């Protein structure tokens, strides 16, 4: 227990663990040699005091280095063996959902060709200007104790759209490369499927080990992902109602859905208007990013959006809930799309239905 602000006692929250990966002395993402470093991710990890590892005669603890409330690192004790780790907090403990393999036979940087021994890419579907950007985590061995690598992003045709030079990458450590969705010229990459390719700096591909090939056979491609410019705003079951040109000077598309479903920004941008109106109910207007000055409008929200005028919004960020406020006969989102320079800023309304249905098909 601890003293709460203003007096009294409170119980600190219990930690929870979502994943554990190897950071150093690794042969795979979850295979580590004694003395190596692991990273634990989860929630409320700021309350952690130790990481407990399985040992031949029970368990052995190691001190933690807390890097945030959602990540910590720990050094693997010499007498640790394979099994699930436990994060021990001040009032409770939490086990990892996956096992950590501890292997004292790992040999790092023993010469020869650079080998790619582990890789994972996420998210499988990313959005331009979204919260989560395509990222590959990978481990290489062979070559020297450290190697100069090149990581390419290629399109469906194998054409390189972006390259990153990674210098002095230590063999047996987890390296991460994140793509911002831009080509070498700085333009947003078109919708489609992409992949990461890890190479030696001379351009030759790193040799893929059997563990990575097995992952591909199991249907989990550790290199591929897709990226899109927009995300469908209604995050749940829905149907389409009145479209552009329906009665009452209808200037958008109605998407019928249950009240309370989350609404997300179809495209990143800046909040231009956030207000309540007798017809529109609670509504928000976002001037969209990378469109030359267009706007998207979301009407009939259940509650006023918590966002403020001038706030920056990411693609896929929650902006409110489906509602029936204003002149609405049922729960729905009324969505409008305006050309540059935007909503009642000199732009004109455009038919959003074809675009909505396209976003709907992949979101």
Task: Describe the residue ranges of each PLM region.
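Structural beta-strand segments of beta-rich domains
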Residues: 34-38, 130-136
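Short glycine/proline/serine/threonine-rich loop/turn segments at secondary-structure transition edges
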Residues: 80-85, 185-193
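Acidic, glycine-rich catalytic/binding loops that coordinate metals and/or anionic ligands
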Residues: 109-119, 217-235, 256, 292-294, ...
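Glycine-centered tight-turn motifs at strand-turn-strand junctions
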Residues: 160-187
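Surface-exposed, glycine-biased beta-strand/turn segments
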Residues: 195-282, 315, 324, 353
